[in-house]
A protein has these predicted regions:
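Extracellular/oxidizing-compartment recognition motifs
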Residues: 1-84, 88-508, 516, 532-535, ...
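Active/binding-pocket-proximal capping segment
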Residues: 185, 193-196, 200-201, 541, ...
Length: 916
């Protein structure tokens, strides 16, 4: 049995951990289908040599348990700051055979209560200059930050550098840099990037929290001179519109900068082989100058004058005598917190699939795929030549960049980059440092592919997909090309919206709207490992929550909204939905402690918004039903309220707050009763079955698919009426001609209901998806789209929205047939798509315990071949409908002669034949 994939819940990287409570996890692999973990031991030590025998930090001892996730480590004395810790897992199987993991490590920073402070205090005569009144007088110097925020006092991008001469002849063992630059920064050491990250640090409410990043630069550190360089741009911290499009200022000018001075800090921790340690900090000894990037508008307008670029500025030997000393700055108000979520990195490279000269000096390049990108342009020409680079998801009939929504024409002409050539080398290369967009098309003006023109020459145009570094998890493929194309469009829509937060679109808005976070979580967890992203989003929600308990519709809240665009439970519910989803998908309760009280405050706030004894109906309803504002407020919002209360009760139980569990359980039961009192129609005078109505048209008893789906999926239907409500749901589908009659909220529960084992109508799902006219996914694809649009319309402002992507969940759970049952897929169900039109389906889900693989194929003889890989430490329940039985491929111990009986498949690989 091999111990693999060791990690720490809530942390993607581990170079700067700032908490004394960690939760470990690991996975196992074994070719023995009977192998089971029966015990484990975890050791943690600052001395690698004592890890097994005398760990100096923590030793779990041998624990009789099969648990592999959510293992709490909380040393009595905490962890020392700026220290490398090693940890290892030993497991024993049922035969007392032991296996050890490789040695893992993490590096600590400072306690989360610490923050950088203003460099000078009014009271510095009486107190240390790094103090803030009394607090840091009593703070252990080893446990607090020593660096100060620095910059040049301006709000335009800057370069900062620090030359470090050797201070010791001792051998360097490890070099770690903690740094942050607001809004975003790139760090380099000796002329090379410190990491593959882009857009560090993650976006937060900088008044509350500022993320710092940890970099291990040991391999780049020299025993001679060293140079640390930082390039800092605006981001959302000090957003710079320039003369371009900037969404927070587009309609109502409610954006307020967090700060007006771009700022940076760094601590470089150099550890020597004799155990000594020195710290190099950001202070006025650093040098600063303006950047060659003259505008860093995060909405993809990033100007760059290559003539101003100081070649070699971040490497040893550069003459910085004309640079100015950095100024100490006050910096942001927020506390420093380690960037725990996955960084943003560059993924796929796109090269143009076609190009077209629109007119002399203007060329359009088609990348073939819409996605979130950072473009890369290689051009050469005379110094001072200006190149304009535009981006678009759409082109007009002539092939020029185009915004089809007339209300957003400013986006068409107001988003561009001006690149001024240096003309001193064979090629001038530009790629953005501080911005990104979503685009399929890149239009270049002022240059030509024809080297005989009197214009600068375009040598290369490419683009890199930019997204979170979170682990990619799987795929689904069928024998239907239109379905595969839709799966692909969903994937690119999701991947293009995952950064340090989950946004709804990477070009027009870039905001952290919370409904996509919670609504799409069951689908997104098939795209990427989202645990650390969701944990960070919950931190954003805590920072954004208002004093009365309200959770706004976005976090961070970069732009103040009002009315239902500010207060809607289908957005705010992320505070109560995400913790339970993290437990369900990743087997961790790490977030419960920090989010529990904020959840209670939100429920108390929502109680003040109840009407008619418990209904909630003040929000956006089924947003996106008719382009924007929706309906079914009482049905949707009250159902979500009910589920929030149930989730808080579950958290209370997990945390041992039994009185609270009883309180919220009773509260939820009250809402259940009120919901059915006002919305369930049982008299059968208008229809021969019970059904749910909306309150959209008082006095009428409408019967819609969304009203039935919400009640069914949230467990609000009394058992005696469940069959009736399913009948009402299918009747509503039939009455619509199997057309989608749902906005983005109802859409998810529409698909979930059609996948419900008691309904199981994949034919209706595909008929809805394939409609000729909107609402229709396939209409998007027939018109050449490669991602999902914002609304059910052709001329849409945003063509890389993921909010309509809830059907992606259906592809995994109802087509591939894989669905988690126990936490983290410890047990999972497999429901092969017997009732569907698919002849072949295959796919993978890289679950927390290991890789799940499924291949379903109908044969010419009429039976089905089903290949299944069940990871170690998990059990699959193969769900068979009536009339289906396994005729070969089962080991003797799980043989069954019954027809239509669920089969428990223990870990292992199976090649089954099923007879229909």
């Amino acid at each position: 049995m091999e111990v693999t994939r060791c990690g720490i819940h809530g942390f993607h990287e581990t170079i700067g951990l700032d908490t004394d409570e960690l939760r470990f996890f690991w996975a196992l692999q074994s070719s023995n289908s009977k192998a089971q973990q029966v015990a484990y031991r975890i050791t943690v030590s600052s001395d690698k040599g004592t890890l097994n025998e005398r760990p100096d930090a923590w030793d779990s001892g041998r624990v009789q348990s099969d648990a592999q996730r959510n293992i709490i480590c909380k040393p009595k004395s905490g962890f020392k700051s700026t220290t490398t810790y090693y940890w290892q897992v030993t497991v024993w199987d049922q035969d007392e055979n032991s296996s050890q993991s490789t040695v893992n490590e993490f590096y600590t920073s400072y306690p989360r209560s610490s923050r950088l402070l203003p460099p000078y205090s009014m009271n510095q005569t009486y107190m240390p200059h790094t103090s803030l009144i009394f607090r840091t007088w009593f703070e252990n110097e080893a446990d607090r930050w020593k660096a100060v925020w620095i910059g040049n006092g301006g709000d335009k991008p800057i370069y900062l550098r620090k030359s470090v001469q050797p201070r010791s002849t001792k051998r360097v063992e490890k070099v770690v840099v903690f740094a942050s630059g607001l809004g975003h920064f790139n760090l380099s050491v000796n002329g090379k990037p410190a990491s593959p990250h882009v857009l560090d640090p993650g976006w937060t409410n900088y008044h509350r929290t500022v993320q710092f990043v940890g970099y291990d630069v040991t391999s780049q550190w020299s025993d001679k001179d060293n140079v640390i360089g930082a390039h800092v741009g605006n981001g959302f911290y000090a957003g710079d519109q320039g003369d371009r499009f900037f969404w927070p200022m587009y309609e109502d000018n409610t954006y307020v900068r967090y700060g007006n001075e771009l700022c940076f800090f760094a601590e470089v921790h150099v550890h020597y082989d004799d155990g000594s340690h020195e710290t190099i900090i950001s202070d006025p000894s650093w040098k600063v100058r303006k950047s060659a990037t003259t505008l860093a508008n995060i909405y993809a307008s990033e100007d760059h004058d290559r003539r101003e670029y100081p070649v070699g500025w971040d490497a040893p030997g550069f003459d910085d005598s004309t640079w100015k000393p950095a100024k100490p700055l006050t910096g942001p108000r927020g506390k420093l917190r380690y960037q725990s979520q996955p960084p943003v990195i560059l993924h796929n490279t796109f090269t143009p699939v076609r190009q077209k000269q629109l007119r002399p000096g203007v060329t359009m390049f088609d990348l073939g795929q819409n996605s979130s990108i950072m473009p890369r342009i290689e051009v050469n020409g005379p110094a001072g030549s200006e190149i304009i680079i535009r981006y678009s998801e759409t082109v007009d009939d002539d092939g020029a960049v185009f915004m089809p929504d007339p209300l957003f024409k400013e986006f068409e002409y107001g988003v561009y980059t001006k690149f001024i050539l240096a003309g001193t080398s064979d090629k001038d290369i530009w790629m953005p440092d501080f911005s990104f967009t979503s685009a399929r098309y890149i239009q270049i003006e002022g240059a030509s592919l024809d080297r005989n023109d009197d214009l600068p020459t375009i040598h290369s145009v490419t683009a890199r997909h930019v997204s979170s570094a979170a682990r990619q998890l799987g795929y689904v493929k069928t024998d239907k090309q239109d379905v595969n194309d839709l799966i692909n469009a969903c994937y690119w829509s999701f991947s293009s919206n995952i950064f340090s937060y989950h946004t709804d679109c990477p070009q027009i808005e870039k905001f952290g709207w919370l409904e996509v976070t919670s609504l799409l979580a069951p689908a997104t967890q098939y795209v990427r490992d989202m645990e650390a992203v969701y944990s960070k989003i919950l931190d954003d929600i805590i920072d954004t929550q208002e004093s009365n308990g309200l959770v706004p519709t976005m976090a961070p809240e970069i732009r103040y909204m009002c009315g239902p665009l500010h207060d809607t439970i289908t957005w705010g519910c992320a505070i109560a939905f995400l913790p339970e989803l993290i437990k369900q998908y990743y087997g961790s309760t790490e977030v419960f402690g920090k989010i529990y009280q904020p959840c209670i405050r939100y429920m108390e706030y929502m109680k003040t918004r109840e009407r008619q004894g418990g209904l909630i109906e003040h929000g956006l309803g089924d947003w996106g039903r008719d382009i924007a504002f929706g309906n079914h407020q009482a049905n949707i919002e009250t159902a979500v309220y009910y589920q929030c209360l149930r989730n808080v009760a579950l958290m209370a139980k997990e945390l041992g707050h039994l009185d609270d569990e009883a309180k919220f359980t009773a509260w939820a039961e009250r809402i259940y009763a009120v919901y059915n009192k006002h919305l369930l129609i049982t008299d059968k005078t208008s229809r021969p079955y019970a059904f749910y109505t909306s309150l959209d048209n008082p006095g009428t008893h409408d019967c819609t698919m969304v009203a039935q789906a919400m009640a069914l999926q949230f467990g609000l239907v009394p058992a005696e009426y469940r069959a009736d409500v399913i009948k009402a749901f299918l009747s509503a589908c039939e009455a619509s001609g199997n057309r989608i009659e749902a906005g983005e909220i109802g859409l998810k529960y529409l698909w979930n209901t059609l996948a419900d084992p008691d309904v199981n109508r994949p034919d209706i799902v595909l008929e809805m998806a394939r409609q000729e006219e909107h609402p229709s996914y396939m209409r998007f694809l027939r018109r050449g789209e490669t991602t999902l649009l914002e609304f059910w319309q052709d001329a849409c402002r945003s063509k890389c929205h993921d909010m309509l992507g809830t059907i992606y969940e259906w592809f995994y759970e109802a087509v591939l047939g894989v669905k988690p049952v126990g936490d983290a897929y410890s047990t999972w169900a497999l429901r092969p798509p017997f009732a569907s039109e698919f002849g072949l389906v295959e796919g993978e889900v890289d679950s927390p315990y290991g890789l799940i693989k499924v291949r379903f194929e109908r044969t010419a003889g009429g039976d089905v071949r089903l290949d299944v890989r069940v990871p170690t430490s998990t059990t699959c329940t193969l769900v068979l409908p009536a009339g289906v039985r396994v005729v070969s491929g089962l080991p003797a111990e799980v043989q069954t002669s019954s027809i239509g009986e669920d089969v428990a498949l223990p870990q292992g690989t199976y090649q089954l034949v099923l007879l229909l």
